[in-house]
């Protein structure tokens, strides 16, 4: 009888040891998973640490970790990737919207520059005032032209004498409106966002078109700030820039339709 009781005690002790005999490695992983807590965009290191420790366990050691704890790690990984994706989406969309504003300012501004170029070469001698010039310069009023000319120390007769003065006057209007400042500010901010996306989220490779869009807009901005070539070349150059940008803008905009 004593022998039988002894066997029962040994068996009970073995069962107890099996239940409580979690290895040190498994215990460390369980604690690392519990340390994750509520998942946020700042949980990257704690989740990565717990995942790394879990991955190096043997199958036997992994089985020592409660199922609900293992599932908690999977849930944390999924939640972090979801939050990470939202951050990337938000930042990339912000960059796109800034570039889109730059595109719009360049297109409308270049329309005015083209009109001024045309007027200065072909119509200035037949005009009588800035009212005549405004008819060929879309989006800019005669009052704005007159105020810009005055700021530059020019008059309408200055346009008659030298067609390039028409360009200077329109560029002054755009400067007064703050278009050039907005363009520079937006391009700087968009570039910073793209740099951050590249450095911190380089695995999000589905945004290459956003970078292409940035490059295309940046090239147009350089031309917009200092248009060159003959008047005959001007229209083709504008069309080439704007057609390329329009296509990229459409492709990139599709990414942000949700």
Model-identified regions with their sequence ranges:
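Positively charged n-region of N-terminal signal peptides that target proteins for export
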Residues: 1-11
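Cys/His-rich metal-coordination motifs, chiefly Zn-binding "fingers/knuckles"
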Residues: 3, 21-22
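Residue position in alpha-helical solenoids
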Residues: 53-60, 193, 248-251
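Short stretches within intrinsically disordered, low-complexity N-terminal or propeptide regions
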Residues: 14, 34, 52, 136, ...
């Amino acid at each position: 009888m004593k022998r039988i009781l002894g066997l029962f005690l040994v068996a009970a002790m073995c069962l107890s040891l099996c239940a409580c005999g979690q290895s040190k490695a498994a215990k460390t992983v369980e604690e690392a998973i519990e340390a994750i807590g509520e998942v946020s965009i700042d949980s990257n290191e704690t989740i990565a640490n717990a995942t790394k420790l879990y991955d190096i366990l043997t199958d036997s050691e992994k089985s020592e970790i409660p199922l609900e704890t293992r599932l908690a790690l999977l849930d944390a990984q999924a939640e972090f990737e979801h939050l990470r994706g939202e951050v990337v989406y938000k930042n990339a969309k912000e960059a796109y919207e800034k570039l889109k504003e730059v595109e719009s300012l360049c297109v409308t501004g270049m329309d005015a520059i083209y009109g001024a170029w045309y007027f200065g070469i072909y119509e200035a001698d037949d005009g009588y005032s800035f009212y005549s010039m405004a008819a060929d310069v879309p989006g800019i009023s005669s009052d704005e032209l007159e105020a810009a000319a005055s700021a530059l120390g020019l008059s309408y007769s200055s346009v008659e004498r030298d067609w390039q003065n028409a360009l200077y006057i329109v560029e002054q209007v755009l400067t007064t409106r703050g278009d050039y400042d907005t363009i520079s500010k937006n391009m700087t901010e968009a570039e910073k966002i793209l740099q951050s996306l590249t450095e911190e989220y380089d695995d999000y490779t589905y945004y290459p078109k956003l970078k292409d869009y940035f490059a295309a807009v940046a090239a147009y901005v350089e031309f917009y700030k200092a248009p060159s070539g003959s008047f005959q070349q001007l229209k083709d150059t504008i069309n080439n820039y704007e057609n390329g940008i329009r296509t990229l803008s459409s492709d990139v905009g599709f990414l942000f339709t949700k």
